[in-house]
Amino acid sequence: MAVMAPRTLLLLLSGALALTQTWAGSHSMRYFFTSVSRPGRGEPRFIAVGYVDDTQFVRFDSDAASQRMEPRAPWIEQEGPEYWDQETRNVKAQSQTDRVDLGTLRGYYNQSEAGSHTIQIMYGCDVGSDGRFLRGYRQDAYDGKDYIALNEDLRSWTAADMAAQITKRKWEAAHEAEQLRAYLDGTCVEWLRRYLENGKETLQRTDPPKTHMTHHPISDHEATLRCWALGFYPAEITLTWQRDGEDQTQDTELVETRPAGDGTFQKWAAVVVPSGEEQRYTCHVQHEGLPKPLTLRWELSSQPTIPIVGIIAGLVLLGAVITGAVVAAVMWRRKSSDRKGGSYTQAASSDSAQGSDVSLTACKV
């Protein structure tokens, strides 16, 4: 497998960016690559997306007409043409690495050429509120299952099966972890700092959730109480239910946090309660944008029982809007890359034309 794919893996920027402020909480930058083979229909489809925290800022799709890495956030558009040229070269190189890796992995698993197969890769870094490196990661998957992952020490690998052991031995012999570590705690961090500064108006904002509760009768004896949090940023939020002060985690239906399509997020948590006992239940909301946690209780006189078909439909639509990003994110691991070369492709130091991603062009899987 190749080591970080070009554009989508932060390339470089050796020049240190002076940090002039402290950020609230930690921040992350992640790249996701997905390659899907299409037997009889030409080259595999390759999709790359980059995220800073919960914001997608770049995207590449080999099926798109432009055949270019494209901006997905206003603050990244200020990067010059050299940056976009480099980013495009990087992802195209990664797509070719994955193309070869798909064939290699098919051989490892003794699979025929008839079926479609998928390679997924995720890598990136986190920084603390002071802008310093916290952790780095690299995870690869094949056909939706873990394949190989960089351990927390950034010096060793964990292989998921016998086939992945082959890749592990290759990468160990080529010292791939050392090269990747240099990128993760160096180049990746510098680019993340740069992006946080350039996009601070959106990336460092906190939008508190708008909350309310809805009541949905199930029968004469039971009803569902649903606690809603809408329009918040960043995505991290906690919704919990209590009955007479006791946690109801076991009985809570909790959906994953969902993008709202406007840069904010939505989430709800629900419990089924005996009719007439609604006021014994409270919903507790914690979010970075709130000065203190909120407590909500159903008040029969304050709002009527309402249907939520419209709200649910809206959430479904929002989910569809970001399907493209999810496709890449679903790849949450995998990167059986096969590249030619021996180390990450890094452009000249402090050259902003370089991408923030890295080129995984070294070892083959």
From Swiss-Prot:
Phenotype upon changing residue 279 to K: In allele A*80:01
Positions of glycan attachment: 110
GO cellular component: cell surface; early endosome membrane; endoplasmic reticulum; endoplasmic reticulum exit site; endoplasmic reticulum membrane; ER to Golgi transport vesicle membrane; external side of plasma membrane; extracellular exosome
Name of the molecule in the record: HLA class I histocompatibility antigen, A alpha chain
Extent of Low complexity compositional bias: 346-359
Membrane topology, Cytoplasmic segments: 333-365
Effect in UniProt of substituting residue 86 to R: In allele A*25:01, allele A*26:01, allele A*33:01, allele A*34:01, allele A*66:01, allele A*68:01 and allele A*69:01
Processing after translation: (Microbial infection) Polyubiquitinated in a post ER compartment by interaction with human herpesvirus 8 MIR1 protein. This targets the protein for rapid degradation via the ubiquitin system. N-linked glycosylation at Asn-110.
